[in-house]
């Protein structure tokens, strides 16, 4: 986060900087590595799933705590995932992610630029320190990567993806799913407790960190974010801005795909309101982080989250790394 800037990649795409890349930390396998309303399609309010958005080691009372760019306590964000790419016997942190079901991680589509083959990916959960593998952490292979067919890498339109775990993860105090914002109508302002977290750079030209960082942010109106001083109207309709106008807290390299999470007192839970997408540098004045809004993808996500085994949807031989367009998505399939 920048200024301390939470990291994500400066892949120079279309003049903007993506918040994901293979940062310099390499790990051996076994190591765990302005008021604004969130825009979204109209829908009827739905009951919130009970078993999500609760951090047992954090406590609901901390939902209003002000965090100013610091190391996260162990277990503070039990849905935080480190998505890592394997190169030989080395694992490297590339992007963050958010555990939303016991076999599904929500992240940013542009993260797949680093590796299209699902079998090169691992999801590390249950730890804040990527150099350690505590007993409660898990390292699970990825078997499928699902991307919207209308994702545009150059402009970050529809920058969202689902990674499917090879096996269901068992929840514990350090591993929990976060709630999806489907059917939640909430006007978010500077009094709403929203946070970002990740293992990215703590300043724009710095290195990634092995210890999970966290910071409190607030939503920034589209008018302010898209002004001539800022992004000049280039924010995708499926995205929004958050951070601080002066750049005090922001996401940066290595943070892509990580959650922007808000604590909603009426539900006593955390919700993933955004997925870290891109920004112009890290922590720069007038250029806050840009986040994909999961609410726009409710139908798309719900379809896949309800499926048991992706591979059974296709009556054909599955070839490693084959790209299929089906059921309204691009699916990168691996061998299970």
Swiss-Prot record:
Q: Where is the active site?
A: 110 (charge relay system), 159 (charge relay system), 256 (charge relay system)
Q: What is this protein called?
A: Transmembrane protease serine 12
> In the UniProt record, which residues carry a glycan?
207, 237, 246
Presence of the UniProt keyword Glycoprotein in the record = yes
Q: Which InterPro entries does this chain map to?
A: Peptidase_S1_PA (IPR009003), Peptidase_S1_PA_chymotrypsin (IPR043504), Peptidase_S1A (IPR001314), Trypsin_dom (IPR001254), TRYPSIN_HIS (IPR018114), TRYPSIN_SER (IPR033116)
Residues exposed to the Cytoplasmic side? 334-336
Q: Which residues form the Peptidase S1 domain?
A: 66-306
One GO CC annotation = acrosomal vesicle
Show the PANTHER family listed in the entry: ACROSIN-RELATED, TRANSMEMBRANE SERINE PROTEASE 12
* Any one Gene Ontology molecular-function term assigned to this protein's record: serine-type endopeptidase activity
Functional description taken from the UniProt entry = Required for male fertility. Plays a critical role in sperm capacitation and acrosome reactions during fertilization, and also plays a role in the regulation of proteins involved in spermatogenesis. Regulates protein pathways that promote chromosomal synapsis formation, double-strand break repair, formation of the inner mitochondrial membrane cristae and apoptosis in developing sperm. Required for normal sperm motility and binding to the zona pellucida, potentially via a role in ADAM3 protein maturation.
Q: Which gene encodes it?
A: Tmprss12
As for membrane topology, the entry says: Single-pass membrane protein
Q: What class of enzyme is it?
A: hydrolase
Gene Ontology process terms (BP) = acrosome assembly; binding of sperm to zona pellucida; positive regulation of sperm capacitation; protein processing; spermatogenesis
């Amino acid at each position: 986060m920048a200024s301390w800037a939470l990291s994500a990649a400066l892949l120079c795409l279309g003049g903007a900087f993506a918040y994901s890349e293979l940062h310099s930390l390499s790990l051996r396998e076994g190591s765990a590595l302005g008021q604004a309303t969130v825009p979204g399609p109209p829908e009827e309010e739905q009951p919130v799933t009970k078993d999500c958005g609760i951090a047992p080691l954090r406590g609901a009372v901390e939902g209003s705590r002000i965090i100013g760019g610091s190391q996260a306590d162990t277990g503070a964000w039990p849905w935080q995932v480190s998505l890592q790419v394997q190169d030989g016997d080395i694992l490297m942190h590339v992007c963050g992610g958010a555990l939303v079901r016991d076999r599904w991680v929500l992240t940013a589509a542009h993260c797949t630029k680093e590796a299209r083959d699902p079998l090169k990916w691992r999801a590390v959960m249950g730890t804040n320190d990527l150099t350690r593998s505590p007993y409660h952490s898990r390292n699970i292979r990825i078997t499928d990567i699902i991307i919207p067919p209308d994702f545009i890498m150059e402009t970050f339109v529809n920058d969202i993806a689902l990674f499917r775990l090879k096996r269901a993860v068992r929840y514990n105090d350090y591993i929990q799913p976060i709630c999806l914002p489907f059917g939640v109508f909430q006007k978010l302002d500077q009094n709403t407790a929203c946070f970002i977290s990740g293992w990215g750079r703590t300043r724009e030209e710095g290195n990634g960190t092995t210890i999970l960082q966290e910071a409190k942010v607030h939503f920034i109106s589209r008018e302010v974010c898209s002004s001539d001083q800022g992004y000049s109207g280039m924010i995708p309709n499926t995205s929004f801005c958050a951070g601080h106008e002066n750049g005090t807290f922001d996401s940066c390299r290595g943070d892509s795909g990580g959650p922007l999470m808000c604590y909603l007192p009426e539900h006593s839970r955390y919700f993933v309101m955004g997925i870290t997408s891109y920004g112009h540098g890290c922590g720069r004045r007038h250029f806050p982080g840009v986040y994909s809004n999961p609410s726009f993808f409710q139908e798309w996500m719900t379809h896949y989250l309800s499926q048991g085994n992706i591979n059974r949807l296709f009556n054909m031989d599955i070839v490693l790394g084959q790209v299929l367009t089906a059921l309204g998505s691009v699916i990168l399939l691996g061998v299970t």
